[in-house]
Amino acid sequence: MMASHAESTARLRLGVVGLGRAFTLMLPTFLADRRVQLVGACDPREQARRQFERDFDAPAYETIEDLAADSNVDALYIASPHQFHAEHTRIAAANRKHVLVEKPMALSLDECDRMIADCAEAGVKLIVGHCHSFDTPYLRTRELIGSGEFGAVKMIQALNYTDYLQRPRRPEELSTAEGGGAVFSQAAHQVDVVRLLAGSRATRVRAAVGNWDPARPTEGAYTATLWFENGAFASITYNGYGHFDSDEWMDWVGEMGKPKNPEAYGGARRLLQQVQTADEEARLKAEGTYGGTRYVSPSPTDDATAFQHFGPIIVSCEGGDLRPMADAVMIYRPHSRDRMMLERPTVPRSEVIDELYLAQFYGVTPLHDGEWARDTLEICLAMLRSSEEQRDITLGVNVEDTQWRENPSS
């Protein structure tokens, strides 16, 4: 069942918890998708609250408690810092609001379990996203796998090289113990995608993480192998130190589905060189997000030309290879090579609204529910532990590890 943008008459009244970077990335979706109406928000920054009230003629509160109590709100989009996700979900559920919470779902499996229980007890839906496993190229690739034409998935290769760690960050974003670093922020995407494509439960993880910039004391890179119950395995690699850009291998289409100028190389590092202290860096980040002095509102004509993505991926099946791109899926059969074009997106990240809308108005259980996101977090935690202990980690058997919390720079 799919409620299209044109066919839908009822609108989902959404409140936003946190008007920072995540909201900035979702805002083009909220503006373009007629199934959604932004009816409220909360943020500790007065400038962001004022801009929201101007832009949407809707109240902006200082606390989530006030927003959650607003009877005009159907669901809450929780885009607050990672360490607040569990508590903010509890407050939303206590007020009978459906929940769309950003990845990672939380920072521990206990927090995930409480979030799932809180929403179940309140009778509200819990969806975790946006995550790149929502992206249409991966969903279409999964459909091709499901057709049976290519046989079983045997191996998945996924990599992404970005400037993630060179972008302006708040102090907690550079602390693994507080949910910062590439594993919590970026592996949550990559693990989700390979889980979707493998179509099976992961059973074992072996990983190594990289932390080689003393000025950015958290993981900036990782590589891991995942094994699945169905016999498939996946290799995932990420590097956020801002040198090679793997969008070069995606036809110079950036993560957000827009053309990327290769001549802009090094822009994040140049911007970061403007600051000398952690406070200055945090201010620089705030200035570029919603309500900030450098924030640029999305233009109605600034449409993505392709779907969003998370770097090059190749799925090797028994009878062929599949390579999801930003605008197509490359299909490699035994005697032919084809490019299956995808219809250009009209609304970025509309796949997230699909799940939220169907959950709200039709009671459909979402794919990216709490249990799904908990399993992704379990793998991320296992990656940290595997790297620390230099061994394989079996999933489902006490993967939580506290050592990285005590010494996040190790």
From Swiss-Prot:
Listed GO MF terms: nucleotide binding; oxidoreductase activity
Induction (UniProt): Induced by phthalate and repressed by glucose.
The reply to whether Oxidoreductase figures as a keyword in the UniProt entry is yes
What pathway is this protein a component of? Xenobiotic degradation; phthalate degradation; 3,4-dihydroxybenzoate from phthalate: step 2/3
The Gene Ontology biological process terms listed for this entry are: phthalate catabolic process
Enumerate the UniProt keywords alphabetically: Aromatic hydrocarbons catabolism, Oxidoreductase, Plasmid
| EC code(s) of this entry | 1.-.-.-
Instruction: Quote any Pfam family the record assigns.
Output: GFO_IDH_MocA
Q: Report which superkingdom the organism of origin falls in.
A: Bacteria
- Protein's job: Transforms 4,5-dihydro-4,5-dihydroxyphthalate to 4,5-dihydroxyphthalate.
Name of the protein this chain belongs to: Putative 4,5-dihydroxyphthalate dehydrogenase
- Source organism (scientific name): Pseudomonas putida
- The UniProt gene name for this protein comes to pht4
